[in-house]
């Protein structure tokens, strides 16, 4: 494979990842298949970077004319519209399953139900409110920091969530599952590119903030793994969405605390 063909392949994989995780239309020349979707996991962090950047731009464009709370709300709405609420849906399904089921089989069955239950609704409301409040506090502290936090959090949270694919067991055996292709064997190159995107985006932060966030994310990932293994024995597409949302919230919390210290 020539260097040009290799670059074209990587661009294809990025667009496949973008098409899977967002509502942004892929170029018509991009062909999607299970193998490409499997390899596209390496670019999930960059998709988060794109979503975070667009959300931050909306915030920065409006924060001089609108109250901080409204600008933050518009940035959150931008992220939700870009992804179609993909991760929020996974969060709600995960909490419905974990909260309403006794056995792993019960939990997986409930998570597959498209109806929203009380556990999922409460989790969704609390996460959105907490995200809004944390971002408003960051915006009042420094609008530049708030926008940068959006970019970092959207990227890093997706890197952590996607990294579960490489180490954990996919526990849903439904062949119609949209996440099934992602559950196939992942190569070390895929993991390296994924992690690199998360590490590189940390460069926009100050040293202590970047180090603090990195250490917290490592610890949080371990905690998420323990919980998922105890609850259902591994992961599903829904739990990856839940992991992303939880990690995003924690990113904002860490940056707010560290920002207050600095």
Curated annotation (Swiss-Prot):
Pathway: Cofactor biosynthesis; adenosylcobalamin biosynthesis; adenosylcobalamin from cob(II)yrinate a,c-diamide: step 7/7
HAMAP family linked to this entry: CobS
Gene Ontology annotations for the cellular component aspect, listed alphabetically: plasma membrane
Name of protein: Adenosylcobinamide-GDP ribazoletransferase
Function, as annotated: Joins adenosylcobinamide-GDP and alpha-ribazole to generate adenosylcobalamin (Ado-cobalamin). Also synthesizes adenosylcobalamin 5'-phosphate from adenosylcobinamide-GDP and alpha-ribazole 5'-phosphate.
Molecular function terms, GO-annotated: adenosylcobinamide-GDP ribazoletransferase activity; cobalamin 5'-phosphate synthase activity
Gene: cobS
Membrane-spanning residues: 43-63, 66-86, 120-140, 146-166, 191-211, 242-262
Enzyme superclass (EC): transferase
Topology of the protein relative to the lipid bilayer: Multi-pass membrane protein
Disulfide cross-links: none
């Amino acid at each position: 494979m020539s260097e040009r063909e290799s670059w074209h392949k990587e661009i294809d994989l990025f667009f496949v990842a973008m098409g899977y995780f967002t509502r942004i239309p892929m170029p018509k020349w991009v062909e999607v298949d299970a193998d490409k979707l499997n390899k596209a996991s390496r670019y999930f962090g960059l998709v988060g970077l794109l979503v975070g950047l667009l959300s931050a731009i909306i915030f920065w464009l409006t924060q001089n004319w609108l109250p901080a709370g409204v600008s933050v709300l518009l940035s959150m709405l931008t992220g939700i519209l870009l992804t179609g609420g993909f991760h929020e849906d996974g969060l709600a399904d995960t909490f419905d399953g974990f909260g309403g089921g006794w056995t792993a089989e019960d939990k997986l069955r409930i998570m597959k139900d498209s109806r929203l239950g009380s556990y999922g609704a409460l989790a969704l409301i609390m996460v959105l409110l907490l995200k809004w409040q944390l971002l408003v506090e960051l915006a009042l502290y420094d609008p530049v920091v708030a926008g940068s936090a959006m970019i970092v959090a959207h990227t890093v949270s997706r890197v952590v969530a996607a990294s579960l694919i490489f180490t954990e067991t996919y526990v849903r055996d439904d062949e119609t599952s949209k996440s099934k292709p992602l559950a196939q064997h992942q190569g070390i190159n895929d993991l390296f590119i994924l992690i690199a995107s998360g590490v590189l985006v940390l460069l926009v932060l100050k040293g202590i903030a970047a180090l603090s966030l990195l250490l917290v994310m490592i610890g949080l990932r371990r905690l998420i793994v323990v919980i998922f293994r105890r609850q259902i024995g591994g992961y599903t597409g829904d739990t990856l969405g839940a992991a992303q949302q939880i990690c995003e919230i924690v990113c904002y919390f860490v940056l707010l605390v560290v920002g207050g210290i600095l």
